[in-house]
Amino acid sequence: MAEKPTNTSVPIPGSEDPQKENIRCLSTLGHFGFECLPTQLVNKSIQKGFSFNILCVGETGIGKTTLINTLFNTNLKETKSSHFYSKVGLTVKTYELLERNIPLRLTVVKTVGYGDQINKEASYQPVVDYLDAQFEAYLQEELKIKRSLADYHDSRIHVCLYFITPTGHSLKSLDLLTMKSIDRRVNIIPLIAKADSLSKNDLQRFKNNIMSELNSNGIQIYQFQVDDEASAQVNSSGLLPFAVVGSMEEVKVGKRMVRGRHYPWGVLQEVENENHCDFVKLRDLLLSTNMEDLKDQTHTQHYECYRSNRLQKLGFSDTGPDNRPVSFQEMYEAKRREFHNQCQKEEEELKQTFMQRVKEKELTFKDAEKELQDKFEHLKRIQQEEILKLEEERRKLEEQIIDFYKMKAASESAQAQVCTNIKKDKDRKK
């Protein structure tokens, strides 16, 4: 059985705070088991699995898919993109990878049609919208009453690999505009794609020009951990941006097979030769050293910035009008009262508007009714006049009919008299 720990107090440096005076640091005299907490955490993490989300931004055909395949040494099947897209789009693919029983869910988001349009003014907007959409989805999950963040598939982008065209001179305006728009939303690692197209002197000059332009435009790129010697060396040795070459083709160099690019005049680039390109440094720093830090930076810096701005737009704040700290309950009650008052005000305004519209409609209906009544009276008078006219015409027609029958009777009588006289004359002649 473990011995009972001593109650000896050990002074804590900088413990002038009165609330910390009663906290004592005790040293145990036996084994209790909580030293296995790191092992428990590792086992739980392995059982749950890891995830990593990469955003690749670059022009069509610059080598985004090839570099991702080279980074993970696998063939992630992708369809080739066309240069004739009318607008910029994004493709999202998720893969399940396994390395020495360590599972990794890899999500690769790539731009499609980026930089192919004549008008490139809004080419960066789909990228910004996608980053904000992932932050918003995570925020909505956080704000749920019954949330399940443990099972939630976090789609927030952890790193943006920005592929720079190897012009050898300077960054394009689109590059500066895009990186300036997303540097507060994602960790940016700039890459010079197809670096084998530049000589060493031109490549170093190009790197210096790129970093100078990034600094002069206030663009923030990812800073590797300073507590790691290799990372600190990258930040200060001028390796950024990384000059990379991707290839899954194995070529023979001497007596060994290496991944490289084979040209008619020979093997110009060995992908994993640090004298040829920075691919190995990029892979080690991205996957072996800083993957977890990239995820932490995404959550603690970029997401928190988005969350803070979003909640402030919704009216939430940590302090009141008098700069006094306000609890969430107080903020909720204040918001509820404000919303209730606003609802009452809007309800009263709606009632007044409704009554005003009712009065206007009533006046409109009265005017329409009066107009219809006048029209009815006018038509009624016209009808009566027409009836009188018809009655007069009928009377005249009846008189004419009577006169006609009288004339007919007189005519028949005269005709009969004539016939009688003619008959008498015939009889006398006989």
From Swiss-Prot:
Tissue: Expressed in the testis and brain including the cerebrum, hippocampus and cerebellum (at protein level).
Coiled coil region boundaries: 329-410
Organismal lineage: Eukaryota, Metazoa, Chordata, Craniata, Vertebrata
Pfam families per record: Septin
Stretches that traverse the bilayer: none
Gene coding for it: Septin14
Disulfide bridge partners, by residue number: none
Region annotation G4 motif: where it falls in the sequence: 193-196
Matches recorded under Gene3D superfamilies: P-loop containing nucleotide triphosphate hydrolases (3.40.50.300)
Sequence similarity: Belongs to the TRAFAC class TrmE-Era-EngA-EngB-Septin-like GTPase superfamily. Septin GTPase family.
Name under which the protein is recorded: Septin-14
GO BP annotations listed: cell division; neuron migration; protein localization to perinuclear region of cytoplasm; spermatid development
Required for interaction with SEPTIN4. Required for migration of cortical neurons during corticogenesis: region residues: 367-430
Taxonomic superkingdom: Eukaryota
G3 motif: region residues: 110-113
The organism of origin for this protein: Mus musculus
PANTHER family: SEPTIN
